[in-house]
Design a protein with these regions (language model features):
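Short, low-complexity disordered leader/linker segments with a strong preference
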Residues: 1-44, 157, 340-341
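An extracytoplasmic/periplasmic, membrane-proximal ligand-sensing/linker region
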Residues: 2-6, 44-46, 194, 232, ...
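N-terminal (or domain-start) structured segment
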Residues: 35-130, 169, 193-221, 230, ...
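Hinge/capping helix and adjacent helix->loop/strand transition within the periplasmic-binding protein
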Residues: 98-105, 119-207, 256, 269-302
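A ligand-binding cleft/hinge motif common to bilobed small-molecule-binding domains
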Residues: 113-123, 182, 186-191, 219-253
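C-terminal lobe and pocket-closing loops
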Residues: 154, 227-295, 324-327
């Protein structure tokens, strides 16, 4: 009798809880429907595009090009460009990492602030892999080794061999300590035996180029866009490009890969990222739209005029690039014992 009564009590209790279960189920279904509606109607309000550097320059130009051309592909939504410079790009990037992952806050990331700075700067709070959702890599900005005419070497092998005759005699200038160009130089030193001395210039590429042309340093790692004009007119020597293929602006300058030196590929790049947790359907839609922009002949011409090489690709490909570069630069910083004060 007791057993039967107990079962009856359990059934009665279960029946009483049915309205609550039904309400919870309806709430879940309603939330799911709203989420699907949000994705289907995306975007239905302005999109913020954070640019972690000031107005002007190639990066800002890319942001404005993307905003103009993405708009008609995204329900004619307003895309607001917000320049947030400071701390080597960390201010704008940190803001993106803390933003709501709803597709309405994006970042024009560059390799320096996303995958290089976190390997060096302890105060940075974001993690390049955990805190962001890659959308699309947009462009490469190839970097290269360029030398003063006083350097006798005329190709990559001769350049490396010459550095070993008097280790440290060849100096290489870059735009500072701990950027992609500096780390590329350390990568060449550790993996190819390049025996040279780093000379950082906090004042930027123009001063580095001026001192190289004047013979105050005898080589440098610079962007192809900065070094290209003096190479073309014969005032400087193009030694090698760090990309996996030759630069469009300097097709006669070989890659290090062509010289049999693998594993040192490096370039600066720009790409779109969102906060981690952004719904994949939104990410895929943004990736498709971004790729359409950088495949457009007019957009390609404008980008190439800035010495930028469009790099259309998938979300997963960009994700793999971020992960591999963060791992690579972390190891280079450790091996070279690079410190940023």
């Amino acid at each position: 009798m007791f057993k039967t009564k107990g079962n009856a009590m359990k059934i009665s209790s279960s029946l009483k809880s049915l309205p609550y279960l039904a309400a919870a189920l309806l709430a879940c279904l309603s939330a799911g429907t709203h989420a699907q509606d949000d994705i289907a109607n995306y975007p239905n309000k302005p999109i913020r595009l954070i640019v972690p550097f000031g107005p002007g320059g190639a990066g800002d130009a890319v942001a404005r090009l993307m905003a103009d051309r993405l708009r008609p592909m995204l329900n004619n939504a307003t895309i607001l460009i917000e320049n947030k410079p400071g701390a080597g790009g960390a201010i704008g990037t940190t803001e993106l990492a803390r933003a709501k992952p709803d597709g309405y806050t994006l970042l024009l990331a560059f390799d320096g602030n996303l995958v290089v700075s976190p390997t060096l700067v302890k105060s940075i709070t974001f993690h390049p892999v955990r805190d962001f959702q890659p959308i699309a890599k947009l462009v490469n900005l190839p970097i290269m080794v360029v030398a003063h005419p006083s350097v006798k070497a005329n190709n990559i092998k001769e350049f490396i061999d010459q550095s070993k005759v008097k280790p440290g005699d060849i100096t290489y200038g870059t735009t500072g300590v701990g950027n992609t160009m500096h780390l590329a130089g350390e990568l060449l030193r550790t993996r190819a035996g390049m025996a040279w001395t780093h000379v950082p210039y906090a004042s930027g590429g123009a001063k580095t180029l001026t001192d190289l042309a004047g013979g105050f340093i005898n080589s440098a790692i610079l962007s192809v866009s900065v070094a290209g004009p003096m190479i073309r007119d014969g005032r400087l020597k193009g030694i090698g490009v760090f990309s996996d293929k030759r630069a469009l602006l300097l097709p006669d300058v070989p890659t290090f890969q062509e010289a049999g030196i693998g594993g040192i590929e490096a370039s600066s790049w720009l790409g779109l990222v969102a906060p981690a947790g952004t719904p994949r359907p939104l990410v895929d839609r943004l990736n498709k739209a971004a790729n359409e922009v950088i495949r457009n002949p007019e957009a390609v011409a404008r980008l190439q005029a800035l010495a930028l090489e469009p790099t259309p690709g998938s979300v997963d490909e960009f994700d793999a690039i971020i992960k591999s570069e963060f791992a690579k630069w972390t190891q280079v910083v450790k091996d070279a014992n690079i410190k940023v004060e």
